[in-house]
Curated annotation (Swiss-Prot):
Species this chain originates from: Malus domestica (Apple)
Cofactor(s) essential for the protein: Fe cation; L-ascorbate
This protein's name: Leucoanthocyanidin dioxygenase
Gene name linked to the record: ANS
UniProt entry tagged with the keyword Phosphoprotein: no
Functional note: Oxidation of leucoanthocyanidins into anthocyanidins.
Keyword hit for Protease: no
InterPro entries in UniProt: DIOX_N (IPR026992), IPNS-like_FE2OG_OXY (IPR044861), IPNS-like_sf (IPR027443), Oxoglu/Fe-dep_dioxygenase_dom (IPR005123), Plant_2OG-oxidoreductases (IPR050295)
PANTHER family for the chain: OXOGLUTARATE/IRON-DEPENDENT DIOXYGENASE
Amino acid sequence: MVSSDSVNSRVETLAGSGISTIPKEYIRPKDELVNIGDIFEQEKNNEGPQVPTIDLKEIESDNEKVRAKCREKLKKAAVDWGVMHLVNHGISDELMDKVRKAGKAFFDLPIEQKEKYANDQASGKIQGYGSKLANNASGQLEWEDYFFHCVYPEDKRDLSIWPQTPADYIEATAEYAKQLRELATKVLKVLSLGLGLDEGRLEKEVGGLEELLLQMKINYYPKCPQPELALGVEAHTDVSALTFILHNMVPGLQLFYEGKWVTAKCVPNSIVMHIGDTLEILSNGKYKSILHRGMVNKEKVRISWAVFCEPPKEKIILKPLPETVSEDEPAMFPPRTFAEHIQHKLFRKSQEALLPK
């Protein structure tokens, strides 16, 4: 039995109710509303800094000079930005379309059907369909619903909570996760070499083939009657090693670069890749975990598929690798497990929320 409370707590329900103003708990504080405008106009803006695009086809070149140049471009993007559009990444347009169609078909189901997959954060069951992944002390809400589940490795998945409708959801999503895992290896090799390490080193440091976990969060941002007052996802950095993002070609991702919010372009057939806190820590700050946020709009539903590549929670101590530390560049981060890092961020965030605005 699906309770009416859970149905009514969904942003999709709220957005479809005909409201012209949003409830106060969705209105962000003034300091968070900087540079919120028409996201479609902002995406067209070609002035100022632009998120770099990396053509990964060159990484497979027979020519070592071409390979080295591509490695250098990727490293530069990781150092300067911590985010990039990957093109020719080896995942077919056909598979990406299948993933997008399957995710959209799930969110197109009646809310009552989606509620069968509802998570229960109070009891620690975070996988499934929900409307708020983390509590913040200010009690503010984000303009999104989501579906969260572990997608790789196979022995860590719980297919019983994956959507059974549409019929090809599991097959498409599982294959996409498998291919993303291969892409993660390819990228981690380049980033290892960029630090002067053996190419397999970073992958080993984040858990290797057995332990690196891929968690998918499908973000569903309904149309919002007052997009200038709300955020789909508030400003944050990812805790992951890497995050790969697919979207439905509706703009919404903004990055905080050189003191300003920059709107990412919608690059056809690309996958957006973020460097997360884990790699920032291991590289002693050489690779950046960039602050970013998700915007909403009045005209179009936005959907994004974020896959977080995360180290095991307790098995590995995250700290700057010895090779990245010197007398001139002392360690910038204390040793913590991945779980401790997450708790530290949540605690810091809750403390900041209690400060007077």
